[in-house]
């Protein structure tokens, strides 16, 4: 279990309320698919993923990115219970989708980069550290069913 200090929780919640879930989610998932092209195999039904412009403009990537980032909203609300919060998604990604759990870490790291881009100087080392801790906790929770 990951323990968050009051300061870390405040850093996460204060930035999260400013995040455009649709825009940031699309960018995070799109960047994951561009930078780590082997992750595209989990998205065969998404159509054209042949180039970075095709990926970033793909409506299915945008829609799923929003869905993914909406789930991160659940993490923000439940930082003290990530394992139970993501139990269903862990089971889905393990049993049905067969997603390599390492990909959860990759997506988390990409999300932190996207957030840093959006917040600029406001994304202080303390804020970044809190978010890194959260995305690592989410990745661990999503990988739980694999163990």
Curated annotation (Swiss-Prot):
Q: Name one GO molecular function term.
A: haptoglobin binding
- The UniProt record gives the binding positions of heme b as 64, 93
Matching entries from PROSITE patterns are given as: GLOBIN
Q: Which residues form the Globin domain?
A: 3-147
The entry's note on the tissues where this protein occurs is: Red blood cells.
Show the Pfam families listed in the entry: Globin
Matching entries from CDD domains are given as: Hb-beta-like
UniProt keyword annotation of Transferase present = no
| Keyword Iron part of the UniProt annotation | yes
GO cellular component terms listed in the entry, alphabetical order? blood microparticle; haptoglobin-hemoglobin complex; hemoglobin complex
Identify the keywords attached in UniProt to this record, alphabetized: Heme, Iron, Metal-binding, Oxygen transport, Transport
One Gene Ontology biological process: hydrogen peroxide catabolic process
What domain of life is recorded for the organism?
A: Eukaryota
Its biological purpose is as follows: This protein functions as an embryonic globin, but the gene structure and chromosomal location resemble more closely the human gamma chain gene, which codes for a fetal globin.
Describe the family membership recorded for this protein in Swiss-Prot or TrEMBL.
Belongs to the globin family.
Tell me, how does this one assemble?
Answer: Heterotetramer of two alpha chains and two gamma chains.
Name of the protein in question: Hemoglobin subunit gamma
